[in-house]
Amino acid sequence: MVYAALAGAAVGHSLGMTDEEIARGIAHYQTVGDRARVLHTPKLTIVSDCYNANPSSTAAAIESLRLLDGRKVCVLGDMLELGENTAALHRQVGERAAQAGVELVLCTGELSRSICEGVRSAGGTALWFPDKDALISALPETIRMGDCILVKASHIMAFEDVTKALLEL
């Protein structure tokens, strides 16, 4: 979303728009589907980014949590189609989450075991669940009032179900 905003600002400047007009346009931007969609409930802030996941987009999404208030929690699933370095790339995402100050990482999916390993190796807290249903069942015990939660995985993981469960807490 940041890159799109910067590109939009550049186009706006080239068309003679003022900084105020550009800022107003960016402030009113709404994402499509589950691409960096920020949802607010009376209890939580949820960043639902379930459409696609790769190491760079996941790292950027984790970094964006710094802009939001609340305890930082990531609910992460497998990033698919990464090739032969899949485990190492998942582990690096986990390390990045811990280094960024994420207090809790919840994962499901075989590949996401490496995310948990990365979180733990960097001194963070991570929980791995055998399937999405088990993860969803654990949400009421692990999520607190005021949490800011990133939900991100490759689309085939169907993490929109996790977002729906969080909205119902």
Segments the model singles out, each with a brief description of its role:
Residues 1:
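Active-site cofactor/substrate anionic-group-binding motifs, chiefly glycine-
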Residues 4:
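Nucleotide/phosphate-binding loop and acidic/charged catalytic motifs
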Residues 7-169:
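ATP-dependent carboxylate-amine ligase
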